[in-house]
C-alpha cells in the first residue's frame, strides 16, 4: 500500500496539532511509531484513506460505531437535527424520550442525566458518590481506564492494594492519594483494601467487563463480592459501562451479569457516533445532583438534540431482532479462524472474546488482569499490526485494545480478515 499522502498530512499535522493527533491513542507510538493512516471517509464496515486505500475497520472508533459507519437510520436522525437546530440550551422532548429508553434498557437507572463524554460521566458519578456518602476515597482497579480526569488518572503503587500515584503529569499527588488501586479479579486484594480504608471509601469504580486492557470478564463471584463488601461499609458501587453498555446485549453488562450497581456511567455507543455521555442510578443518590441537590454538574452541550437524536436512532437499530446474534456469530467465526492459523504457524496467542468484541494477546498465558496483559508481547503485536494494516485491516494501534465487529461486517469480511491473519502469521513465523 502507498501511504504518501498520509505521511505528508501527518508531517503537516505535527506543525499545528500537538503530536499530530487529537488523542494519543491515535498515534502509532505503541506500534513502533511512524505516520498514522489518515482516513478520509467511512461507510459500513470500511474506511478509505487519503491515498485511496480501502480497509476493513475493526477499530469502530474505539467502540461507539457498533452499527457500522454512516448507518442510514442514524444519518437521517443527524440530518433532522441539522435542519432543526443542533443546540438549544433548553429542554427538548428528545432528551425525555432517550432517558426513558435508557431506563427501560438498564433498570438500575432510576434517574439519568446527560453529559458530553464518558470522561464527564465517570467524573460526575464520583462527585455524586462523594456528595451522597460524605467520604472522599475511591477504589479502582489496575489497568482500567475511566477517562482523563484527574480523579482517575492514577496508577497503582507497589503491593496488592495501594494508595495511588499520579499516572500523568499535572495530576496532584493529593488527588492520587484519594484513590486506592487493586488488581482486577482479585477478591482478596479488594477485601484487604476495604478492611484498611473502607470507612473512608465513597465508591468502588469498576468496569463490569473490562474493555481497556482488552476484553476481560470478571471471575465468577468477583462483582458480587464487590457489591457485598462495599455495601457492608457504606460505600457505593459505580459501573463504568462507557464501553460495555449495548455492546454485548441490548442493555448493560450489568443486565448480562445479573448484578446491579448504585450508579452507572455511559458513553460511546449511546451517541450513535456523536459525542455523548450519561450517568444514572438510584433515585435517592441521583437527587444529590443540582438543581435538586448540592452536587453541581452542568454543561452547555449536554443533551444537545444532535447527539440525543443520533442516540435514539442507534438504540432503535440495536432493538432489531438478531442484532447481537449476528455480532456473536461473526465474532466466533473470526476467533476460530485466528486460532486455527496460530496453531498452524505456532504463534503464541490467547484470545479473549465476548460476542462481537475480542482481543488477541500475543501470549500463551490466560489474561484475567492487567499484570498479565502487560506481560504480553508488544513487539510481536506491533509487527502483526503493520502486517495487517498493509493488507487493508484497520486495528487499534495498541496490544491492549479490542477488535470490534459491527452490524455492517459480513462473513466475507471475516473470511478475508482470517486470510490476512494467516499471511501475517506466516510472515511472523518466517522472520
From Swiss-Prot:
Mention any Pfam family matching this sequence. Aminotran_3
- Named cofactor requirement(s): pyridoxal 5'-phosphate
Enzyme nomenclature, EC number? 5.4.3.8
Pathways involved: Porphyrin-containing compound metabolism; protoporphyrin-IX biosynthesis; 5-aminolevulinate from L-glutamyl-tRNA(Glu): step 2/2
Query: Record's InterPro entries?
Result: 4pyrrol_synth_GluAld_NH2Trfase (IPR004639), Aminotrans_3 (IPR005814), Aminotrans_3_PPA_site (IPR049704), PyrdxlP-dep_Trfase (IPR015424), PyrdxlP-dep_Trfase_major (IPR015421), PyrdxlP-dep_Trfase_small (IPR015422)
Top-level taxon = Bacteria
- Where does the record place it? Cytoplasm
Q: Which reaction does it catalyse?
A: (S)-4-amino-5-oxopentanoate = 5-aminolevulinate
Sample GO molecular function, one term: glutamate-1-semialdehyde 2,1-aminomutase activity
**GO terms under cellular component:** cytoplasm
Which sequence positions carry the modification called N6-(pyridoxal phosphate)lysine? 268
For this chain, the family text in UniProt reads: Belongs to the class-III pyridoxal-phosphate-dependent aminotransferase family. HemL subfamily.
Q: What is this protein called?
A: Glutamate-1-semialdehyde 2,1-aminomutase 1
Q: Which organism is it from?
A: Anoxybacillus flavithermus (strain DSM 21510 / WK1)
Give the lineage: Bacteria, Bacillati, Bacillota, Bacilli, Bacillales
